[in-house]
Amino acid sequence: MNVSIEQKYQALLNIVPFVSHETMNDLIQFESLILQWNAHINLISAATIPVLWIRHILDSAQIYPLHSNFLHWCDLGSGGGFPAIVIAIFLKTKKAGHIDLVESNGKKIAFLRTVISQLNLPATVHHCRIEDVYQKIKKPDVITARGLACLDELLQLIFPLLTQKTIALLQKGRDYAIEITNASANWQFDLLKHKSKIDKNSVILEISHVRSCRG
């Protein structure tokens, strides 16, 4: 899909009300790096390359405005940098805040660190399993995860990182209602559902005050 930079910019403005030229330039550079590296390592599905801007970058960008006032973010299973790198780009423009990225794949770690270095982003990559990061980072204000695990497993993973004020923003597809039902057997939590601005069948689950029912 041949889309001009101006068209990309207008599409982004539909997601995030104000976007600086610096932010837009960084997002374009990130898109370029994704395409370069994807020829050698699997960062995104080949089927989504023609719609990379919409399917991955805009899908990630819609996360940030939900809680742009928070400064300390953490993304679990960061993979190709969605939504983590996109959030880091917005934090850079704000000139405040930081995001921790947790990823176990060495090749993807190399990619993420390259992007962070080239774009001078306020982000740190932790090369470890999620369970091993609990003692390495400060408990965040916001936790994100995209396509990582079912909700029940995600709540188990994020539980040690939570405070009473922590919010989790978890992107989910068409089966989200089933995941909520299954997770509710083991967890109690406050929930807000935000409809995705990119995919009508997807949502962003805003979860807080997580309590285990397992005793």
UniProtKB/Swiss-Prot annotation:
Keyword annotations: Cytoplasm, Methyltransferase, rRNA processing, S-adenosyl-L-methionine, Transferase
Recorded GO CC terms: cytosol
Any Pfam family: GidB
EC number: 2.1.1.170
An example molecular function term from Gene Ontology annotations: rRNA (guanine-N7-)-methyltransferase activity
Keyword Metal-binding: no
Name of the protein in its database record: Ribosomal RNA small subunit methyltransferase G
UniProt organism field: Bartonella quintana (strain Toulouse)
